[in-house]
């Protein structure tokens, strides 16, 4: 059994820890920003996580550029976020998960995935579950429905990028059990796993935070499914903590990285 590669969001504090030999990772996770890709590659291998929006009014990326960045960095998969929007489906209620809403949303998502597959091949496309925040937000609930996600994977032959924190946020909104939801997703197609801490910040549940004991338990449970053969071993497990810019700098603590990256490295290595 080969273990997944451990990736962590690139940040200067993380790069300093890597350079000092205080933590070990397999590669950095970076957005499709040329300057950040260059900074990460100066410190070690990296892969690109693209801002592709599936089910929105536009994909949000230049697919030819994405293909070139994949080649330049060795990024193995072109990811897309399953984000069907009210703008694209003005006559579908946000909370509608009836058969017709699911059919329409799935058909549009399949069409968008096929646009990606035409550039890189379906086997190199992965789709990511995103957090559903309720009917007062713009994301259609059908986009997080496991039946829709499963149909997209079945119809296109793409893989799944499972974000455990996003799944937790979704199930908290819907009042569902986390594992009932996750196990209904097409985990047989798992290619990449994202993990991060989830806790309330200013009265709202947020992710991309330090792991709590509960978060670590969720990661252990996911890895146990891989160890038991219920899930395939993904290519990467990415710790989505830290980063650059105002969105991430306030949650980029070197002490957290120094403690939690080795913990995740140990957990991931246990699969090898």
Give the role of each language-model region:
Residues 1-14, 23, 32, 244, ...:
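N-terminal pre-catalytic "stem/leader" segment of glycosyltransferase-like enzymes
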Residues 4-10, 26-30, 44-50, 76-80, ...:
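Hydrophobic faces of well-ordered beta-strands that scaffold small-molecule active sites
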Residues 95-106, 170-234, 242, 247-251:
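Gly/Pro-rich active-site loop or hairpin
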Residues 248-272:
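C-terminal helical cap(s) of enzyme catalytic domains, especially alpha/beta-barrels
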């Amino acid at each position: 059994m080969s273990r997944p590669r451990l990736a962590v969001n690139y940040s200067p504090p993380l790069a300093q820890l890597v350079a000092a030999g205080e933590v070990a990772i397999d590669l950095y996770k970076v957005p499709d920003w040329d300057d950040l890709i260059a900074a990460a590659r100066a410190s070690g291998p990296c892969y690109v996580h693209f801002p592709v929006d599936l089910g929105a009014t536009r994909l949000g990326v230049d697919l030819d550029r994405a293909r070139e960045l994949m080649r330049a960095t060795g990024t193995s998969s072109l990811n897309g976020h399953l984000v069907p929007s009210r703008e694209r489906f003005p006559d579908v209620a946000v909370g509608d998960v009836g058969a017709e809403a699911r059919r329409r949303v799935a058909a549009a998502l399949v069409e968008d995935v096929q646009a990606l597959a035409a550039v890189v091949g379906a086997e190199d496309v992965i789709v990511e579950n995103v957090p559903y925040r309720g009917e007062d937000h713009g994301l259609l609930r059908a986009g997080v429905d496991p039946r829709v996600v499963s149909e997209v994977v079945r119809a296109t032959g793409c893989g799944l990028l499972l974000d455990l924190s996003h799944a937790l946020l979704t199930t908290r909104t819907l009042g569902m059990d986390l594992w009932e939801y996750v196990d209904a997703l097409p985990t047989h197609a798992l290619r990449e796993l994202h993990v991060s801490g989830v806790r309330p910040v200013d009265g709202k549940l947020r992710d991309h935070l330090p792991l709590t004991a509960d978060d670590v338990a969720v990661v252990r449970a996911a890895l146990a499914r891989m160890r038991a053969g219920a899930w395939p071993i993904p290519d990467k497990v990415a710790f989505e903590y830290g980063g650059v810019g105002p969105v991430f700098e306030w949650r980029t603590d070197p002490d957290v990285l120094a403690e939690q990256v080795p913990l995740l490295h140990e957990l991931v290595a246990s699969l090898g």
